């Protein structure tokens, strides 16, 4: 059976199938492994052994206990990526949010039941572990100045959040850039997105969150357009030092007015 036929039968992308065949999925989902075993009619001790290895692998990652909260298995994709480039227009990127900031976001949501808020926050904090994982991705984010100045929760929450960003900028895998208001109109004004890039020659994926669901697009032309869009906002953004200086200035203003 050809790779294309297998991907079609499983309703997987070709990139996902390629990663599984090369054993490059770092945290395989049990349901995905079971689907492959069913397709290839693997039974008995071999099946039990492979499922046992799957559970051992999953047990090493804190966020898998929250797998039901991530449509499209975003943490799996982040873990398999070699680089994530993100543009955020209104919010601090999820990978860089503090618990208090994330709590304020979920508490303001009309679609997250109050009883689910803490688990949502915990899942977001667990997801950050990908940045410290061996072989984890490089994370480059461009944050619109509007996201820094929008008060989420309170000024105290924002002070803590922005100071946390400054601390995370020292992480060797993290680059934080600010797109200032003075940059004016730009090509990414339609909204936020993340570009996940995998080992060559696998295609990249564009992730877009609508607030209700996450969309994942592998279409090559679509991904290429978003590479150009990211490059454009990256070129308009302040350099890392000026970005951190602006973040610190805004944090100091919040702190003074808290």
Regions found by a protein language model. Give the residues of each.
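Interdomain hinge/linker segments and adjacent boundary elements that couple functional modules
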Residues: 4-9, 22, 26-149, 232-258
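C-terminal regulatory/effector modules of DNA-binding transcriptional regulators
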Residues: 135, 152-258
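Short Gly/charged-rich anion-binding patches and loops
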Residues: 2, 31-32, 160, 164
